[in-house]
Amino acid sequence: MTKKVGLLVMAYGTPYKDEDIERYYTDIRHGHKPSEEMIADLRGRYHAIGGLSPLAKITEAQAYGLEKALNESQDEVEFKAYIGLKHIEPFIEDAVEAMHKDGIEEAISIVLAPHYSSFSVEAYNKRAKDAADKLGGLRIKAINDWYKQPKFIQMWADRINETAKQIPADELLDTVLIVSAHSLPEKIKQHNDPYPDQLQETADFIFEKVVVPHYALGWQSEGKTGEPWLGPDVQDLTRELYGREKYKHFIYTPVGFVAEHLEVLYDNDYECKVVTDEVGATYHRPPMPNSDPEFLEVLRTVVWEKYSN
């Protein structure tokens, strides 16, 4: 009989329907109920992208697509995918419990975010480990980051180069690539958190492989907590770069994300485009990885390498 290995795929989660918005937001806020204004603001942003974020369906397609890719590429073990979400059901603990019930004794976990941070990925891993320890008999090998995987870098470089084809050749010199990820509270730097450096490395790796002659690093989608977050914010960065260099084309590449969700469809496609329109430049964004076979191959390679070692 083929050995069964759990595949715990963890992600942020998104509301499934309008009624979920309040409890989802309450979970993000550590149990503090948001004000009516906050809920209205979030609802308004979902409305602006045409309804609730497609993230839930994309996460499912990524998890089960990865399971299929792993099982079709070898016959040593059979992987079984379980989705564990941070802010809505199925929660990470629900997924670990389901693995335990299915008699899984060994699992690999991956967070659908390429960069490690004590604030994000570590929090996912800790919840999974705590749940497994409590139940007993289940060992989870966690993947901390996977931004260095050459196939990941190549995938983004190919997408950027494809997007650059839309730009007239004589305007390519006036084009800048903005590489970004979700901002985190600035206090992570006090603990030597590798997150900012990992984004910088990702940008450097990608920049070596693209035809775009300039790039800058930005942060986006920061929380409204009143404390300082990592910057510059992509919108401020756009204004600053235009003011200094008069770039005609801005290519936004939110490499910290892997799907078309609110942070991309609103914070990039709407908010950043407002700024490029304002300064008279053109907005571009390569397609997100979603559940494209090319991206599933990136994840498959990462998981298989972790399992094999």
UniProtKB/Swiss-Prot annotation:
Cellular component aspect of the GO annotation: cytoplasm
Keywords: Cytoplasm, Heme biosynthesis, Iron, Lyase, Metal-binding, Porphyrin biosynthesis
Source species, domain of life: Bacteria
PANTHER family (alphabetical): FERROCHELATASE (PTHR11108), FERROCHELATASE, MITOCHONDRIAL (PTHR11108:SF1)
GO biological process entries: heme biosynthetic process
Residues that hold Fe-coproporphyrin III according to the record: 12, 29, 45-46, 53, 124
Name the UniProt record assigns to this protein: Coproporphyrin III ferrochelatase
Entry annotated with the keyword Ribosomal protein: no
Record-listed E.C. numbers: 4.99.1.9
Family: Belongs to the ferrochelatase family.
Function, as annotated: Involved in coproporphyrin-dependent heme b biosynthesis. Catalyzes the insertion of ferrous iron into coproporphyrin III to form Fe-coproporphyrin III.
Known catalytic reactions: Fe-coproporphyrin III + 2 H(+) = coproporphyrin III + Fe(2+)
Recorded metabolic or biological pathway in which this protein acts: Porphyrin-containing compound metabolism; protoheme biosynthesis
Gene3D superfamilies given in the database record: 3.40.50.1400
Residues the record lists as binding Fe(2+): 182, 263
SUPFAM superfamilies (UniProt xref): Chelatase
Subcellular localization: Cytoplasm
GO MF terms, alphabetically ordered: ferrochelatase activity; metal ion binding
